[in-house]
């Protein structure tokens, strides 16, 4: 026999935004693509950079592993109901010596295109020769993501029970995350906070909450 449960009202508030961003090499003269062109690239209709005003190079359109955060956003925002083409792959040896096929990692070659989430990509070392592609003429940055002018933005929220006591840890965290200090931490982590904040989070404060000061150098694989 089923039980009757009382459902408590939820207090929910937006914390900030992330976004799906597209990248290619600074060696590539293509700086802007449209939403339709992105869908056509990843469905296999557009195959060469010259179709976008670039060099005569076959587009190496990298993808992310299935069910990763970036891939879920790609399917939701860009592809919608259109099937993606087969991704570039590579064979990797396991610890047991077996070879398995996996989605290839982005290599930033002149013919490459890839995508990631903004919070990760913005903290990558700029000297790696990457550039953000504009979408519909809009560059992904904190201002365009915050305003919603950039098309592929993804808001995230904080939620607690509406009847949570004001002196409870959950309520205090809720209030703090929405404060200027909390919004500064959202920015420090690489996301885009709802509100601009000039507050700086010190490395000592980051360590107090279990976070280390972020490292702007990334080597090896490019995307989460």
What does each model-identified segment do?
Residues 1-224:
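Exported/periplasmic ABC-transporter solute-binding proteins
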């Amino acid at each position: 026999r089923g039980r009757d449960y009382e459902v408590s009202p939820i207090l929910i508030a937006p914390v900030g935004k992330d976004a799906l961003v597209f990248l290619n090499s600074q060696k590539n003269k293509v700086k802007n693509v449209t939403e339709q062109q992105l869908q056509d690239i990843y469905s296999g209709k557009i195959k060469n950079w010259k179709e976008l005003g670039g060099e005569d190079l076959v587009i190496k359109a990298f993808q992310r592993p299935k069910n990763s955060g970036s891939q879920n956003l790609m399917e939701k925002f860009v592809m919608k109901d259109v099937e993606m083409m087969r991704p570039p792959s590579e064979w990797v040896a396991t610890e047991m010596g077996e070879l398995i096929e996996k989605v290839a990692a982005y290599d930033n070659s002149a013919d490459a295109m890839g995508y990631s989430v903004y919070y990760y990509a913005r903290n990558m070392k700029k000297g790696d020769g990457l550039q953000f592609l504009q979408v519909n003429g809009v560059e992904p940055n904190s201002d365009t993501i915050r305003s919603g002018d950039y098309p592929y933005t993804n808001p995230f929220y904080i939620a607690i029970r509406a009847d949570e006591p004001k002196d409870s840890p959950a309520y205090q965290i809720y209030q703090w995350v929405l404060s200027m200090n909390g919004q500064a931490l959202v920015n420090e982590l690489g996301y885009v906070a709802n509100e601009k904040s000039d507050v700086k989070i010190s490395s000592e404060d980051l360590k107090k909450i279990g976070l280390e000061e972020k490292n702007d150098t990334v080597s090896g694989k490019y995307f989460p």
